[in-house]
Amino acid sequence: MNLQHTPLHDLCRDAGGRMVPFAGWDMPVQFSGLLQEHQAVRQQVGMFDISHMGVLRLEGTNPKDHLQALVPTDLNRIGPGEACYTVLLNETGGILDDLVIYDLGTNKQDSQSLLIVINAACSKTDTIWLKQHLQPAGIALSDAKNNGVLLALQGPQATKVLERLSGESLASLPRFGHRQVQFYGLGAKDPSSVFVARTGYTGEDGFELLLKAEAGRALWLKLLAEGVIPCGLGSRDTLRLEAAMHLYGQDMDINTTPFEAGLGWLVHLEMPAPFMGRTALEQQAEQGPIRRLVGLKLSGRAIARHGYPLLHNNNKVGEITSGTWSPSLEEAIALGYLPTALARIGNEVEVEIRGKHHRATVVKRPFYRRPSLS
């Protein structure tokens, strides 16, 4: 198998990264160990190479208006320097991918450029889908990553570390805010302009940075010198699951609607604009979905994994989509789908794990919420 390498691949190996195949890329699953990496992000700061993810630039006349036809979230709610999380839908309201849209415009009335970050596993299909629907309207799509680096710096100390390295104040940048930040000492050409967004996939404060390969490699080494712990896919998964953040392909897919996935807050049916799958979602909003994604806490230390059956009165009623041992809570947690009648908080079901039944209780999501948001 010919796996792709990010510009940080050799630096990840040098830092002790244990590499595994992921979505066609050779990526680090862990460095010092999952628990240490997880705790570093929860308590201090950690960094992730996420350069495997897709980054697209949309340019043209009012690209937001044309992209609106493909997503259920009112894009007029964001302006220049702002971003939103949403989902890409098909005609039946099924989720093709989840993504973050960044408005790169200079004013809200005349936004000519957007940035979209998409999942690595969906990068090719998303690009084809977007081109199919946007190019006829005169919207140009291009690879904004351009073999560069996408790096996530996450944790309560992320702001201090990034301010120290950039010399700029970032504390006032709001959640889902973004701007260009000038860094010195990241390459032959000073300063290096870095796209910095206050976004992440861990449930902690933090930033995601897009920059050229040379500058990205230099920044990685500077962060290591600052004592920032490199983190792999393993801790990224436990962190996002504690925060009840969805993993596309596991917790939702093309056969899942936003209402089923607990993402109904992304569907703005009050806006007049038509969008892909609107009719199906209007009907589901009126009737209610027949199943829902729920958070579960398990008794004991058994771990529920993707695909494990959920049982009620010894009958299979659903499946686990994601599960792990929570380092922060010291409990087994999981996400899974249950019939709506069984999806109420406090209800008990069972998970079948290697032939044995383990009690699981439906709980409120997220499982973990960082102290500043409590």
Curated annotation (Swiss-Prot):
<dbReference type="InterPro" id="IPR006223">
    <property type="entry name" value="GCS_T"/>
</dbReference>
<dbReference type="InterPro" id="IPR027266">
    <property type="entry name" value="TrmE/GcvT_dom1"/>
</dbReference>
<comment type="function">
    <text>The glycine cleavage system catalyzes the degradation of glycine.</text>
</comment>
<dbReference type="GO" id="GO:0005960">
    <property type="term" value="C:glycine cleavage complex"/>
</dbReference>
<keyword id="KW-0032">Aminotransferase</keyword>
<dbReference type="Pfam" id="PF08669">
    <property type="entry name" value="GCV_T_C"/>
</dbReference>
<dbReference type="GO" id="GO:0008483">
    <property type="term" value="F:transaminase activity"/>
</dbReference>
<dbReference type="InterPro" id="IPR028896">
    <property type="entry name" value="GcvT/YgfZ/DmdA"/>
</dbReference>
<dbReference type="InterPro" id="IPR022903">
    <property type="entry name" value="GCS_T_bac"/>
</dbReference>
<dbReference type="GO" id="GO:0005829">
    <property type="term" value="C:cytosol"/>
</dbReference>
<keyword id="KW-0808">Transferase</keyword>
<dbReference type="InterPro" id="IPR006222">
    <property type="entry name" value="GCV_T_N"/>
</dbReference>
<dbReference type="InterPro" id="IPR029043">
    <property type="entry name" value="GcvT/YgfZ_C"/>
</dbReference>
<comment type="subunit">
    <text>The glycine cleavage system is composed of four proteins: P, T, L and H.</text>
</comment>
<dbReference type="InterPro" id="IPR013977">
    <property type="entry name" value="GCST_C"/>
</dbReference>
<dbReference type="Pfam" id="PF01571">
    <property type="entry name" value="GCV_T"/>
</dbReference>
<dbReference type="GO" id="GO:0004047">
    <property type="term" value="F:aminomethyltransferase activity"/>
</dbReference>
<comment type="similarity">
    <text>Belongs to the GcvT family.</text>
</comment>
<protein>
    <recommendedName>
        <fullName>Aminomethyltransferase</fullName>
        <ecNumber>2.1.2.10</ecNumber>
    </recommendedName>
</protein>
<dbReference type="GO" id="GO:0019464">
    <property type="term" value="P:glycine decarboxylation via glycine cleavage system"/>
</dbReference>
